[in-house]
A protein has these predicted regions:
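Conserved glycine(s) of the Walker
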Residues: 157
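P-loop NTP-binding catalytic core
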Residues: 41, 45, 51-144
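N-terminal anchoring/assembly modules that precede and organize ATP-driven motor systems
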Residues: 1-53
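Conserved AAA+ ATPase "sensor/coupling" helix adjacent to the nucleotide-binding pocket
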Residues: 115, 260-264, 303-304
Length: 318
């Protein structure tokens, strides 16, 4: 045990050394994405800004060392036959996607960092990323303990907004106990009473089920990707734990519930009983990346009970 711990610490020290070419970006709280192309060009995405070229070139060997050091720490191999690395960089909790030859002309990787920004909903309004009307709807939903879905595409700031909503819970309901489940450590909770679990994707169902024995007031899930997990979260939210939140990939406020329905198809041999969705979800908040501006809440939809004459979900959209 001691030997393995010593090996891990040595490998971590090696990784720290190898990360020096991008360490400034790793430690910059506004940086969300670090991209190194096969030619070594270092591109940076900062929250609220367009992706920009840093003007720097990272040498091929430095790129390869970052990939290999990360792989060694997370017990994965990268070779000419296993040319892809997917994982999380230890200590920094940044998601890494990397390729080496022969799939690419030269080693390349992309890092997605967990947000370090501590923004409030007031900050979003001040920066023009959230209208006062939308803020009022979100705040009322938090107060009324409605379940909230936060949707958008990749890199639209869903988790950053989720963190701001958690801060709103802490402000309005500081005694509420939060139970947080995610498969990558990205949620930055500032509530006084919470338990946060980081689990493998195949352990998410167990983690959500265990929530019921942990006396939570609200259950918060990082991102819904799988039907069984979504079903467990919906069931938990409908059995005495309202006021939860989670993120989901969708291209509009009115596309979130259909997306959730599509995930649930994994769990049902026949049609999904849609009432378990519209009875559980109260508000859908949709973010979009605005060119040269960054993420902005562009649509909020209140879910209405029942279905329309065509069997579709009903909303009041703002």
């Amino acid at each position: 045990m001691a030997e393995s711990q010593t090996l891990y610490q040595r490998q971590l020290a090696n990784l720290e050394q190898d990360l020096k070419p991008i360490m400034a970006e790793l430690l910059d709280e506004r940086v969300t994405d670090i991209m190194v192309n096969p030619g070594g060009e270092l591109w940076i995405k900062r929250f609220g800004e367009a992706t920009s070229y840093s003007g720097r070139i990272v040498e091929r060997e430095a790129i390869l060392r970052i990939i290999m050091s990360t792989a060694a720490l997370i017990d994965k191999k990268v070779t000419k036959d296993q040319w892809n690395l997917t994982g999380v960089v230890p200590k920094y909790n940044a998601r890494i996607e990397a390729f080496i030859e022969p799939t690419v002309s030269s080693p390349t990787f992309c890092l997605r960092k967990p947000t370090l920004l501590a923004l409030s909903l007031d900050d979003y309004v001040r920066d023009g990323r959230l209208s006062s009307a939308h803020q009022k709807l979100i705040t009322q939903a938090v107060t009324d303990r409605k379940n909230i879905l936060i949707g958008g595409g990749t890199g639209t700031g869903k988790t950053t907004l989720l963190n701001a909503m958690i801060s709103e819970i802490a402000r309005l309901r500081p005694s509420d106990r939060l139970y947080i489940v995610e498969d990558t450590p990205e949620i930055n909770c500032r509530a006084p009473n919470f338990v946060s679990l980081v689990v493998l994707p195949n352990e998410s169902i167990k983690a959500v089920r265990s929530a019921l024995r942990y006396k939570p007031d609200r259950i918060i899930f990082g991102e819904l990707r799988y039907g069984e997990v979504a079903l467990e979260w919906l069931k938990a939210s409908a059995t005495g734990h309202p006021g939860g939140m989670c993120t989901i990939h969708a291209d509009g406020a009115q596309r979130m519930l259909p997306r959730l329905r599509d995930l649930l198809l994994e769990c049902f041999s026949t049609a999904v009983p849609l009432n378990i969705i519209y009875e559980a979800i109260g508000l859908c908040v949709y973010l979009r990346e605005i060119p040269d501006f960054g993420p902005r809440v562009v649509e909020v939809a209140e879910v209405r009970p029942g279905l329309d004459a065509g069997g579709n979900f009903q909303y009041e959209t703002y």
